[in-house]
Regions:
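N-terminal compositionally biased, intrinsically disordered segments and leader/signal-like regions
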Residues: 16-17, 38, 60, 66, ...
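Conserved active-site-adjacent core of cysteine acyl-enzyme catalytic domains
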Residues: 28-31, 76-81, 86-89, 127-272
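N-terminal, intrinsically disordered, polar/charged segments of Gram-positive cell-envelope systems
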Residues: 28-86
Length: 272
C-alpha cells in the first residue's frame, strides 16, 4: 500500500508540472498573431458589407467565368422615360399661366389673354371679349379672336406675308402630311416662344363630356426620346371643370389626338 501511495503522489506531481508548463507557454505566445487575426477578420467584413450595396449579378452563370461578360452585365441600361405609356424626351414648355374663363362662353378671350400674358402683355378677358365681338349663344369666331390677338401681340390685326403674326389653319382632314406640318409648327412656335391657339371638341378629349366647341392655349410640347419630333402636346385649358388640383389647366395629348378632336367642330382651326 505504501508503494502505491508513492506512485500516486509521483503521478500527481508530474500532472501538476505538465499543466503549469502548458499555462506558462500559452502566456508567452506572441500577441501579433491575435492582432493579425483580428485585422483579417475586419477586412473580410468590409468586403462583405461593400457587396451588400451592389446588385447581385451572379444569377448569370457565365458572369462567374468571364470578366468581360461581368462588366457588360454590371453596366446600367439607359431607360427611356415614359408619360402615359408614351416614350418621351425633353420637355419644351412655355410659361403659360392658367386663367379661368370668367363667363361660360369666354374660352377664346381667356385663351388669348393667357397667350398675351405669356409674352408680358396684360389684357383682361372682358376687354378682349368686347373687341372680339364675343356673343351668346355661340362665343367667339376664331377669325376675330386671332385678329385681336395679333393687334395686342404685334400691333396690327392683319399681318402681311412678310410680317410676324398668327395665321389660322383649318383642319379639313388628318393625314401624315397634315400631322407633320402641325408638329413642325408647334416646334417652331415653341422655339420662338409663342403659344398656339387650338379649337377642338372637348367631348373627344375628356371622357364623359358632351360634344361642344372649345378654345385652349398651346403651351409647347414634349419631344420624342431622340428630341427630334413631337411626342405630346402641352395646352392650358381655361374651363373651370377641366382643372387639376396640382397642374391647373395644364394638359398633354398626342398631336394626332388633338388634330382628331378639331375635326367636326364648326371652326376646326388652330393658329400658329
Amino acid at each position: 500500500m505504501a508503494v502505491q501511495k508513492k506512485s500516486i503522489i509521483v503521478i500527481a506531481i508530474i500532472s501538476t508540472l505538465a499543466i503549469s508548463i502548458a499555462v506558462l507557454a500559452s502566456r508567452m505566445r506572441p500577441r501579433s498573431v491575435t492582432k493579425d487575426t483580428q485585422a483579417s477578420s475586419a477586412k473580410s467584413e468590409i468586403v462583405n458589407d461593400s457587396k451588400k450595396d451592389q446588385p447581385d449579378h451572379n444569377t448569370r452563370k457565365d458572369s462567374q467565368t468571364n470578366n468581360n461578360q461581368v462588366s457588360q452585365v454590371n453596366s446600367p441600361k439607359e431607360e427611356v422615360e415614359k408619360l402615359y405609356g408614351i416614350p418621351i424626351g425633353k420637355r419644351n414648355k412655355l410659361n403659360v399661366t392658367t386663367q379661368i374663363q370668367q363667363r361660360w362662353n369666354f374660352c377664346a378671350p381667356a385663351t388669348v389673354s393667357m397667350m398675351l400674358a405669356s409674352r408680358g402683355k396684360i389684357v383682361d378677358q372682358f376687354t378682349l371679349a368686347r373687341e372680339m365681338g364675343t356673343y351668346e349663344p355661340f362665343g367667339t369666331h376664331n377669325r376675330d379672336a386671332i385678329r385681336i390677338l395679333n393687334k395686342h401681340m404685334f400691333g396690327y390685326e392683319f399681318p402681311q406675308t412678310n410680317q410676324a403674326g398668327y395665321r389660322i389653319e383649318t383642319v379639313r382632314e388628318i393625314n401624315s402630311a397634315s400631322i407633320e406640318l402641325f408638329k413642325q409648327r408647334i416646334i417652331k412656335n415653341t422655339q420662338d416662344g409663342y403659344p398656339m391657339y387650338y379649337t377642338f371638341n372637348p367631348g373627344k378629349i375628356y371622357p364623359g363630356i358632351a360634344n361642344a366647341e372649345h378654345n385652349v392655349a398651346g403651351a409647347g410640347y414634349i419631344a420624342t426620346p431622340d428630341n427630334k419630333d413631337v411626342a405630346l402636346v402641352y395646352y392650358v385649358d381655361p374651363y373651370y371643370k377641366f382643372q387639376d388640383p396640382i397642374y391647373g389647366g395644364l394638359k398633354v395629348v398626342t398631336p394626332e389626338e388633338l388634330l382628331n378632336a378639331m375635326v367636326g367642330v364648326s371652326e376646326p382651326d388652330y393658329a400658329w
